[in-house]
Amino acid sequence: MPQLNPAPWFAILVFSWLVFLTVIPPKVLGHTFTNEPTSQSTEKAKPEPWNWPWH
């Protein structure tokens, strides 16, 4: 029963995860965010009433 022998597939699994973890994170972390968060004031804006034309 070759599936019970962990030598070939376990080495391939570990090596593939090692490659993924060394290649993918620098690519993902290399992206820059275009919209930097800005601080907003805590005061609520007072809405102005609309002047509806009642024709």
Swiss-Prot record:
GO biological process terms, semicolon-separated: proton motive force-driven ATP synthesis
Keywords in alphabetical order: ATP synthesis, CF(0), Hydrogen ion transport, Ion transport, Membrane, Mitochondrion, Transmembrane, Transmembrane helix, Transport
Keyword Transmembrane appears in the UniProt entry: yes
Any GO CC annotation of this UniProt entry: mitochondrial membrane
Pfam families xrefs: ATP-synt_8
InterPro entries referenced in this protein's UniProt entry, alphabetically: ATP8_metazoa, ATPase_protein_8
Domain of life: Eukaryota
Subcellular locations according to the entry: Mitochondrion membrane
Transmembrane regions: 4-24
Recorded GO MF terms: proton transmembrane transporter activity
Region (Disordered): 34-55
Membrane topology: Single-pass membrane protein
Record family assignment: Belongs to the ATPase protein 8 family.
Protein purpose: Subunit 8, of the mitochondrial membrane ATP synthase complex (F(1)F(0) ATP synthase or Complex V) that produces ATP from ADP in the presence of a proton gradient across the membrane which is generated by electron transport complexes of the respiratory chain. ATP synthase complex consist of a soluble F(1) head domain - the catalytic core - and a membrane F(1) domain - the membrane proton channel. These two domains are linked by a central stalk rotating inside the F(1) region and a stationary peripheral stalk.
Subunit structure: Component of the ATP synthase complex composed at least of ATP5F1A/subunit alpha, ATP5F1B/subunit beta, ATP5MC1/subunit c (homooctomer), MT-ATP6/subunit a, MT-ATP8/subunit 8, ATP5ME/subunit e, ATP5MF/subunit f, ATP5MG/subunit g, ATP5MK/subunit k, ATP5MJ/subunit j, ATP5F1C/subunit gamma, ATP5F1D/subunit delta, ATP5F1E/subunit epsilon, ATP5PF/subunit F6, ATP5PB/subunit b, ATP5PD/subunit d, ATP5PO/subunit OSCP.
Name this protein carries in UniProt: ATP synthase F(0) complex subunit 8
Chain's gene name: mt-atp8
